[in-house]
Curated annotation (Swiss-Prot):
A Gene Ontology biological process term: response to amino acid
Gene source species: Pyrococcus horikoshii (strain ATCC 700860 / DSM 12428 / JCM 9974 / NBRC 100139 / OT-3)
Any one GO CC term of the record: cytosol
Top-rank taxon: Archaea
Domain HTH asnC-type positions: 6-66
DNA-binding region positions on the chain: 25-44
Alphabetical keyword list: DNA-binding, Transcription, Transcription regulation
Paired cysteines (S-S): none
Name under which the protein is recorded: Uncharacterized HTH-type transcriptional regulator PH1055
Family annotation (PROSITE patterns): HTH_ASNC_2
Gene Ontology MF annotations: sequence-specific DNA binding
Gene3D superfamilies found in the cross-reference section: 3.30.70.920, Winged helix-like DNA-binding domain superfamily/Winged helix DNA-binding domain (1.10.10.10)
């Protein structure tokens, strides 16, 4: 994938939106020295190009939900279409909150949640058991979220 360059102003907009995704274009403009319309154009352009996604980040630990990260090793001889089918199922599952392709001993990292440990276990089993492409997996139970999607959870350090 080709590396894309962002301007200094684009990075400033992104930095402010990471701190407060609801910040108005006018407020961003005041802080970085651009007009409201210039900020709006840049923000919309970043969103249209797929570089910027504004979304909510659910804090499972704050809600009392149980969550885990599942490391999955894909069988080396698995046909590409089987792997894509598995990844699509992960992406469509309502209990997955993060999915990454990773390098190392495992190929995929999946964030999964449930209301309690029993539901979490069921959700993980539904994702993994019976998948022909899965060679092995490892579950890491989440204890506390300190940072997610580049946003530090400073209050998590207080406990």
């Amino acid at each position: 994938m080709k590396k894309r360059k962002l301007s200094k102003k684009d990075w400033e907009i992104i930095k402010l939106l990471k701190k407060d995704a609801r910040m108005s274009d006018a407020e961003i403009g005041r802080r970085i020295g651009l007009s409201k319309s210039a900020v709006r154009w840049r923000r919309i352009n970043l969103q249209k190009r797929g570089y910027l996604l504004i979304s909510a980040y659910l804090r499972f630990d704050k809600l009392g939900y149980t969550y885990a990260f599942v490391l999955v090793k894909i069988k080396p001889d698995t046909p590409r279409n089987e792997i894509l089918k598995f990844k699509k199922a992960l992406m469509e599952n309502e209990h997955t909150f993060e999915i990454y392709e990773v390098l190392g001993d495992y190929n995929v990292l999946i964030g999964v949640f449930g209301e309690d440990v029993s539901e979490l276990k069921r959700n993980i089993q539904e994702l993994i058991i019976g998948q022909k492409c899965v060679q092995e997996y490892k579950v890491l139970l989440g204890a506390k979220s300190l940072k997610g999607l580049e946003v530090p959870f400073w209050d998590a350090l207080e406990d």
